[in-house]
């Protein structure tokens, strides 16, 4: 890691791994539930891109804001958006990050 301008500690690398696993498990759940018809609207999965979002978000501060694409679940999770609120949002339920009105493609957390 001599040439790496962003050397990471073992704890930071472990946290990055945990974040990537959380994203993947979240996406796998959505994939199954969408295939069963349990989710209203459309779902654009982020699976396979976990490292990109995690690596970027771990270098942002709490005050930094992000804007994502229609495949933004991983960005949101890596930035620290509450996973339960995200799941409620995707299912169109109250208590979601946008009170269930944004769905998969319009997850937002302005806090």
Regions found by a protein language model. Name each.
Residues 28-32, 38-111:
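Cofactor-binding active-site loop characterized by glycine-rich and histidine/acidic residues
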